[in-house]
Design a protein with these regions (language model features):
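C-terminal secondary-structure termini that scaffold catalytic or DNA-interacting sites
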Residues: 138, 215-224
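C-terminal catalytic core of tyrosine-transesterase DNA break-rejoin enzymes
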Residues: 70, 74, 80, 150, ...
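C-terminal catalytic core of Y-nucleophile DNA break-rejoin enzymes
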Residues: 38, 104-124, 130-150
């Protein structure tokens, strides 16, 4: 797995430091060939995302989590970054509209995201709700995951809803599929390398190829 590869790479680095300092004579991982599997990037289709957005929730508890999940789908923010948002993270961007300006807690990479109408509506809905400077009502992560399972069942979605999936949905369904340049998507996601973002572009292209193959099958009777 990728986790094992990363662990072995750390051991290899430690041994190299030991060799450089004369504490060891050989690195047992020197000839190890590293192989990373491409991570599966699940995401919601526009139909699924619309279902989540429009489905009436049976409780305020689930409504809050649904709104925060949708917010992440339209901003690309990870759970911890959305949870940390305060008023000072809202700035006026170069287009004279509200933007989010923050840093990814995972990598410290800067993130600038122009706010679309949907996340702006969600922020307006919860303005002053928390009683402090936080912008959104977000409970502990484990509770969020439990609530998201309930929401998926209510919406008839078989995919496992997580904030990772929301972030992937932003990258694919919300931005790349709608023609946002990959360089812009990479910057909004806080990726340090365009190579990381290209995984999403491949997903979009694979989906496009599948859709066109299905369309070709349906249109076979029109062949000249």
């Amino acid at each position: 797995t990728n986790y094992m590869m990363k662990t072995i790479l750390k051991y290899k680095s430690v041994y190299q430091v030991a060799i450089d300092n004369g504490w060891a004579q050989r690195n047992p991982f020197a000839n190890f060939k590293f192989h990373y599997e491409q991570a599966e990037r699940g995401y919601l289709t526009m139909d699924e995302l619309t279902r989540v957005m429009q489905k009436a929730m049976p409780s305020k508890r689930l409504e809050h989590i649904r709104d925060v999940f949708v917010f992440s789908c339209f901003t690309g923010l990870a759970y911890c970054d959305a949870q940390a948002l305060t008023r000072e993270h809202i700035i006026t961007g170069s287009n004279n509209r509200p933007w989010l300006r923050t840093h990814r807690q995972k990598t410290s990479a800067p993130v600038d995201v122009p706010l679309l109408d949907v996340p702006l509506q969600i922020l307006a809905k919860y303005e002053g709700y928390s009683g402090n400077d936080r912008l959104l009502p977000i409970p502990a992560n484990q509770k969020c995951n439990d609530y998201l399972k309930e929401i998926a069942a209510i919406c008839g979605i078989e995919k496992r809803l997580t904030f990772h999936l929301a972030r992937h949905t932003f990258a694919t369904t919300v931005t790349l599929t709608n023609g946002v340049p990959i360089e812009s998507v990479s910057k909004m996601l806080g990726h340090r390398s365009l190579k990381t973002t290209q995984i999403y572009a491949k997903i979009v292209n694979d989906k496009l190829a599948e859709d066109m193959t299905n369309l070709s099958t349906r249109l076979q009777h029109l062949a000249m």
